[in-house]
């Protein structure tokens, strides 16, 4: 998915690096394959005396046998990890900006107030419920809502919060229960 951000250029560069690493890996695989047969034959010859120790020699030789290949795969894993980290940072940046915009759209929240994401979501949900309740009660005076009626988030024009919840659940605007 293209966002047109700097991370797209970085992703393209990382893909090009992976392609180059793939070419190196193919040329190394041929070299490693020829070495593997030589090392396997030496393991078979030396394997019978080492069986008494539980095959510890084989465990130690296995990583050295794969070291040329594992170096290339480690670089590939690191590139993939860096790409995933960059995508995650970009995702978190977008999410933080969205929460900032949501916080600034909420009335009665001063700009310098530090709200957690959970608090922001709760206030937004409460404000939406408040607006639904106003629409359900049709409290318009000449197309204008009087500020006295806007007592969110505590109560709506003198009604307790329990009445507000009943109105909100009774007047769902979306979903399968909408009429």
Curated annotation (Swiss-Prot):
Q: What is its main location?
A: nucleus
Q: Name one GO molecular function term.
A: protein dimerization activity
Q: Does the keyword Iron-sulfur apply?
A: no
Any one Gene Ontology cellular component term annotated for this protein: nucleus
Cellular location of this protein? Nucleus
Q: Entry's SUPFAM superfamilies? A: HLH, helix-loop-helix DNA-binding domain
User: Can you cite a GO biological process for this protein?
Assistant: negative regulation of androgen receptor signaling pathway
Q: Which InterPro entries match?
A: bHLH_dom, E-box_TF_Regulators, HLH_DNA-bd_sf
Domain (bHLH): give its ranges.
Answer: 79-131
SMART domains in the record, alphabetically? HLH (SM00353)
Q: What UniProt keywords are attached to this protein's entry?
A: DNA-binding, Nucleus, Transcription, Transcription regulation
Ranges of biased composition (kind: Polar residues): 70-80
**Claim: Metal-binding is one of the keywords in the record:** no
Stored Pfam families: HLH
Protein task: Involved in epithelial-mesenchymal interactions in kidney and lung morphogenesis that include epithelial differentiation and branching morphogenesis. May play a role in the specification or differentiation of one or more subsets of epicardial cell types.
Quaternary data: Efficient DNA binding requires dimerization with another bHLH protein. Forms a heterodimer with TCF3 and binds the E box (5'-CANNTG-3').
Name the chain's protein: Transcription factor 21
Species, as recorded: Bos taurus
């Amino acid at each position: 998915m293209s966002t047109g951000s700097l991370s797209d250029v970085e992703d393209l560069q990382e893909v090009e690096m992976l392609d180059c690493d793939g070419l190196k890996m193919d040329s190394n695989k041929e070299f490693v394959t020829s070495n593997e047969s030589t090392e396997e034959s030496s393991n078979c010859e030396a394997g019978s005396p080492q069986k008494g120790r539980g095959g510890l020699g084989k465990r130690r030789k296995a990583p050295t046998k794969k070291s040329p290949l594992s170096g290339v795969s480690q670089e590939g894993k690191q590139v993939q990890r860096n790409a995933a980290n960059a995508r995650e940072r970009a995702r978190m940046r977008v999410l933080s900006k969205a929460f900032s915009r949501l916080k600034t759209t909420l009335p009665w929240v001063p700009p310098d107030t530090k709200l957690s994401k959970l608090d922001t979501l709760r206030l937004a949900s409460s404000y939406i419920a408040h607006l639904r309740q106003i629409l359900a009660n049709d409290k318009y005076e000449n197309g204008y809502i009087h500020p006295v009626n806007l007592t969110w988030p505590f109560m709506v024009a003198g009604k307790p919060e329990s009445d507000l919840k009943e109105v909100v659940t009774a007047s769902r605007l979306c979903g399968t229960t909408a009429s």
